[in-house]
Amino acid sequence: IDSFLDANLVFSREHQVYILSIESLSEYTYDRMRSAYEFYLDGIESALSKSEYISGNDLTLADISYVCDFSQFLREGKYQEILKNQGFKIISQDIKDTHPKSINHLLNLSELKEFSSIMGSYLDWYKN
């Protein structure tokens, strides 16, 4: 779990910089975020190919942290026009094809009462 949480912190730092600068995004920041996204989700895909949850066969802090932090990153979907006007696309737009285990895990967990009672309809635009 510790190594996942370390990777999660790095990803979270990158997505905070990305989201906070999204209205005047540099190519450097966008490319950094894209690299962090791919590295992070490649790790999630690998973990989920071995077990039902990120860190084994039971729900752990790794899964909870993933839902919270990755959902925050997905706010980029609300900035599609702003990104497009700057010549960028939503980094996560192909997630269902490139990282299907990751998005399915997120959406499945978000349906659990413990998550849905807090998240509400936050992820609805990714469910289609």
Enumerate the predicted regions with their spans.
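All-alpha amphipathic helical-bundle segments outside canonical DNA-binding/catalytic cores
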Residues: 32, 51-62
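Alpha-helix C-caps/helix-loop-beta hinges
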Residues: 50-51, 112
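Conserved C-terminal alpha-helical bundle
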Residues: 1-50, 74-85, 89-91
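C-terminal helix/juxtamembrane-tail motif
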Residues: 120-128
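Short His-centered aromatic/hydrophobic patch
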Residues: 69-121
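Short active-site alpha-helical segment characteristic of glycosyltransferases
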Residues: 66
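A structural signal for short, well-ordered beta-strand segments and their strand-loop junctions
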Residues: 10-13, 53-55, 117-119
